[in-house]
Each structure stands twice: as C-alpha cells, then as structure tokens.
Amino acid sequence: MSESLNQLLHESFSKNWNHKALCDLGKTPLTYGEAAQQIVKLHLLLQEAGIKPQDKIALCGKNSANWSMAFLAAITYGAVPVPILNDFKAESIHNIVNHSDARILWLDDAVLNAISLNEMPTLEVVMQLGDFTPVYSKEEKVIKFCSELDKTFAEKYPNFGINDLVFHKEQPEEIALINYTSGSTGFSKGVVLPYRALWSNVRFAIDNITYLKADDGMINMLPLAHMYGLAIEMLFPLCKGCYVYFLGKTPSPKILMGAFAQVQPKLIIAVPLILEKIIRSKVLPTLQKPLLNFLMHIPGVSNLILSKVRKQLIAAFGGQLEMIVLGGAALNGDIEDLLRRMKFPYTVGYGMTECAPLIAYAPWYEIRKASCGKIVDRMEARIVPLHDGEDVGELWVKGSNTMLGYYKNQEATDSTFKDGWMNTGDLCIFDKDGFLYIKGRNKNLILGPSGQNIYPEEIEDKINNLPYVAESLVVDREGMLVALIVPDFDKAKQDGIDAEAVKELINNNRAALNKMLASYSQITRFEMRDEEFEKTPKRSIRRFLYK
C-alpha cells in the first residue's frame, strides 16, 4: 500500500487550504486551513496529556464540525479514536470507555449530563466537544495548558501554514480505530479496524464516485459513530476536497429540504427508510389520485408522468443530484419497482462495521432489482452453503477492508475468521454476473430511523426479565419495533392471575421497558402469543418464521 489514509487527508488539506471543509447547520463554515489549525492545537494538547501513538481516545457526542476535528486530530496524531453513539444509555458508554482502555473522552453537554465520570476510573482527561475545554483532568498541568493553548499555538506557529501540518505516518496493519457495535455488557464487540481498511474504503469511493469534485457539498445525516457515516459521509468527502454539512441530529423534513436546497448535493448517503418516507409522502399520494392512477395505465403517458415526477423529486433533493446510495437495510420492493420505472438514480450497497464498511456496490445505472451490487475492489467473497446443493449460503469475505478482530475478545475473533476468510453471518446468493443478493441476516440486525444499529437480542434480554414473560422476539414492522411475547401462564396461574390479566400486566410494563432503551430502539407495541415460539434443536427461536 504505497498510499495511506493520512496521506490522502494531508494532500486534500494542502490543495484546498482556503476552501470550505466543515459546516454546522446555521453556522459559518470552517475552511480546511481553519480546521487544520484546530487539529494541530489538539495535537499539542494530546502531547501535553502524555498521549502516545495507539493510545485510545473515546468520542461521544452529536455529529458536528468539532466532532469531526476531534476525530481527525486523534487519527492524524496516531492515537486510536473510539467513536461512541451518543444515543447509548450511560451504562453502555461507561462499558465502552472502560473496555476500550480509553485515556481521554471527548463529549458534548448532553452526554456529560447523562454519564457518571466515577464509573470510568481509568480516564485521565475529559473534554468538551463544544469548545474543547477540559471538564476533568487527573493532572492540573493539562487544565493550565488548555487555558493557554491559543497563546502556546501562536508562539509555536506565528505564521501557521500547510508546512506546519504534520500527520502521523501509519502502517497498513496499524490500528486506526475501534468501533463498538453495541455498548451492553455481554453483547459488546469492539471492531478493531486497521488503517488499510479505512484507506481501502475511501480509495474505492474516490475511484468510483468520480462526479464528486472539490468544493461540492455533502450532507451528513448518518451517525459518525457508525462506519457508514464516518467513512462515506466524512472521510471520503474530506479526502476529495469537498465540504461536509452537519445537520447534528435527526432532522425534520423542513430542515432536511432546506439543507438540500442550500447544499445542492450531488451525492446523498442514506438508509432506505429516509427515501421510502419521502416517496410515500411526496410521490405516492400524487400518483394515487384517480386521474393520474388511470393515466399511469396508458403506455407512453405513464412514462411522461414518471419523468416529470423524477424531475420534481430530484429538485426536492436540491436539483443537482447524481445518486443516492442506500445501505444498512433492504429497500421496500414496491418502492424499488417505482424508482426503477422512473429511472431514479438510487443504488443499494452492502457492508458491515467489520469491513469499514464496504463489501458490495454498483452505480445506479448498473444495479439490479433487490441486489446490492458487486464485491468492491481489493475484496474477495465466496458463498459457503449451509446445506449441500444449495446456492444460498453464508457470505465469507477477505481483503483490504476486513477488520483485525474484536478488541480483547479472541474467542469471538476466532469464531469469525477461518483461514483468512471472515464470516459475515449473512445468507446470500450471487447471480451469474456476480451481483450479490442478501436473503437473510443471521445477525438479525435492525436499522434505526437514522442508521443506528438495533440488536433485538439485547431488547429481548430486557423484556424477558419483566414479570410473567416467558420469552420474546422483537421484529421490525415498517420502521416500528414490535415485541412478540409469550407470557409465563404457569407462573401467573400459581399466583392466581388469569390469562387476560397477565397479558394486561405485561402490557403495562412497556413504558418501564422503554425507559431502559435508547429512543431509537423503543418498543411501539407488545403483541401477546398463547403458544411458545417454534425452536431449533438447540432451542433457539426460528426467527425467520415471525414477522
């Protein structure tokens, strides 16, 4: 690997020094040069705090320009950033900080108010993302240094310029970051990603999304604490000399449309739910009007109508749209049929945290219905059938994008890798031309409204601890989480409670359950079952039978 991630970043900062780089919603944009200045200030701070290459630095806050600069400061210093989803409950944040051996924690006000620093005894410095001021430091000298940081910087760099910007020269197999797929004890896995994986993802995006040019804007909607948002909505555009516009939180349709109009993005990265909502609210009501519905059945006329709808839809996205890349979940079949009929520029990719994240992709004009593209550059894939003679099987991959393993979890690492191949846990099939189709996800992952990973087993673990619950199964129904519950009728009978009363009692505990869950993973409805779930010989629930 002659090229590296930090080299790509350094070249982009150098070429685009006076161009826009980072912008928070409603704020003045920062140039690449201004961002570089803040990054170098943070390098000085890390040095004063005694941070060495490969030391861990946790980040937990809403998406923002400062979050981005904190991450870039860590990775270009040679430290290992540990991004944490700010929607996680306090206990999960404590678990990740402790398990990752983080020495520094950068956070925002909301996270600071939610957590307890006493639960993270190994932390040496805690800093605000809002203004990069210290909240806590084991050593007084760090707080003093922070108060004089601007003065120290000005003295060290009286005429700060690109020649003063020095980035860590990484090795391909060196740890770049640790990304936790969850925060709960017992479920937590820290995915250890090397620099080669980040570089390979960014390089693929640069080579295959050629219409994005320096000075183009990208809107960040997905969580930066997840690899999809981090690699494709932040690192990739910054390596291209683009600017990133941070919405900061799940936006209202009004804010989103305003951002599209202002930024006029050529590329939008999203989860399918966002596009599906726009189609259902903006397009379907129009097409379902009696007259248009009639005209849609007339050959030729329907094409004219769909062409007009396509133009209106692209205008709603800012007017310059070249492509929307969807990932993280399957696109609704009916919506996909409509998008294909109107030749709308969408595509569906496939990836996972363990591949930082890309595994498969194809541009919109090549993608096939229900497919998620072809295996990306520098990666190989094979299907391992669960049963002899079947085309569908588990997808195994290897190549530049794959992780090193799970942090401090050799057992999980060993169970995922075999002879250099990594098991994705997803059931897939290839067609004769190499397009990949996902038939089912062994990992049962559910995608939240803004791209958050929802692990149903974790929610079920909490539900099963509620009074009179025998077993449960969490399913996704059109974006709403529903818990299928089998009450413990025997226990209820022993306590003199009849069947209907125990169902009501369990239902009354839904609010208490949701208080234990992040907002995006809360249960909309309990649905009671009179019979237990069908099981495998190992007594695992046959999840695919229940929707």
Regions found by a protein language model. Give the residues of each.
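Conserved AMP-binding A3 loop
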Residues: 31-33, 176-202
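Conserved ATP-binding/catalytic segment of the ANL
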Residues: 375, 382, 389-390, 394-448
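Gly/Ser/Thr-rich phosphate-binding loop
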Residues: 266-269, 279-367, 470
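AMP-binding/adenylate-forming catalytic core of the ANL superfamily
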Residues: 105, 399, 405, 427-519
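Conserved pre-ATP/AMP-binding loop-to-beta segment of ANL
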Residues: 17, 151-180, 187, 211-217
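Conserved structural elements of the adenylate-forming
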Residues: 36-41, 191-213, 221
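Conserved AMP-binding/adenylate-forming core of the ANL superfamily
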Residues: 10, 18-50, 55-64, 68-72, ...
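Conserved AMP-binding/adenylation subdomain of ANL enzymes
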Residues: 199-217, 227-311, 320
